[in-house]
Amino acid sequence: MTAQASNIVWHKASVDRESIEKERGHKSVIIWFTGLSGSGKSTLANALNVALFKKGLATYVLDGDNIRHGLCNDLGFSDSDREENIRRIGEVAKLFLDAGVIVLTAFVSPFRSDREKARKLVKENDFLEIYCAANLDICETRDTKGLYAKARAGEIKDFTGISSPYEEPENPDLKIDTGLKDIDQCVEEVISKLIELNLVK
């Protein structure tokens, strides 16, 4: 990584977050979905995106695969690259937060320390960690890309759940059994949590 740039100044937005939230009628928040590959993070994030959009809310999905096509296409899957991947996502999510958007991030984000760093970028009530809890067997049966099979065959190195660890959240804001519940139930659980926290109506 290059040295940190100097002689730069943060420019405050001409329209602040509070004004945007007041105009739109809802708060912005980072909803951070974490879990194994195949646990349903992207599926749930996108289904929730549709549900919130239908309510007239401003939302955006940051998906792990999509981000690696552009912003993070220079990163691999070593521990240090995973850390940098999540650091970048945390910063991007913070920008969306300031823009008054409900940002839905769907990343394996296997290490607790990296998720905690992302949380600490914003205020306590601005970050909601949701653990998509599905056991490894279920995740493997959902693997349409064949990634788990390749990992078990040694064709993919540093694959979370097989050759690289996943550190489960110790105290997530919400834990959903995405292995057994259908997508509508999962979406309803998240929306109920958002209502409970007065983030949406």
Curated annotation (Swiss-Prot):
The active site is at S109. It comes from the Bacteria. Transmembrane segments: none annotated. It holds the Pfam family APS_kinase. It catalyses: adenosine 5'-phosphosulfate + ATP = 3'-phosphoadenylyl sulfate + ADP + H(+). The keyword Acetylation does not apply. ATP binds at G35, L36, S37, G38, S39, G40, K41, S42. GO terms for molecular function: adenylylsulfate kinase activity; ATP binding. One of its GO terms (biological process) is sulfate assimilation. Pathway: Sulfur metabolism; hydrogen sulfide biosynthesis; sulfite from sulfate: step 2/3. Its EC number is 2.7.1.25. The keyword Membrane does not apply. PANTHER family: BIFUNCTIONAL 3'-PHOSPHOADENOSINE 5'-PHOSPHOSULFATE SYNTHASE, PAPS SYNTHETASE, ISOFORM D. HAMAP family: Adenylyl_sulf_kinase (MF_00065). Catalyzes the synthesis of activated sulfate. Belongs to the APS kinase family. This is Adenylyl-sulfate kinase. The gene is cysC.
